[in-house]
């Protein structure tokens, strides 16, 4: 009887530990992913970028913003805005690879890490991002055209500081918004004008 009880108790403890580990993994995943889009969130982005910069791995950050998103929410409602975010997120997920990860940064902003700063690969990825916005989205059952502005900054070319790299990509994105939207721009002297 004692042997049976010890075996059962060990089994129960292993099962409990397994359930606790599963719960921890679910909580960790939830803490690092955006609920609406399923993409990794800003916290996960910062952790991943910090690891790359800490290891001195050249990389490129692309900040993406849906043009006139407030107008979508104001005209069609927040449910339609959520639909637009989900559709853009799904397209960005389709682009992901071993060297490209998409994140929901904030509001209608997404951010990508390309684990390369090679100019041809960066440009190819920027054009792929433009295609994400070139396709219509379905809002309330109707197809609508959206646009997106994309800012690009590379480590270590533009800066070797994590926070500054994000600022550089953001500055480049706002340059696009200022100059007509629905395009991409690289951070550089032209963004400082």
Model regions and ranges:
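Conserved long alpha-helical elements within nucleotide-processing catalytic cores of c-di-GMP signaling
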Residues: 25-32, 38-60, 67-97, 103-107, ...
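Selective detector of the "anchor" transmembrane alpha-helix that sits immediately C-terminal
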Residues: 1-7
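Cyclic nucleotide signaling catalytic output domains
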Residues: 102, 128, 142, 149-157, ...
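Short catalytic/binding micro-motifs of nucleotide second-messenger systems
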Residues: 94-99, 131-143, 175
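A structural signal for short, well-ordered beta-strand segments
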Residues: 61, 110, 148-152
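Core hydrophobic beta-sheet residues of small sensory/regulatory alpha/beta domains
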Residues: 61-63, 186
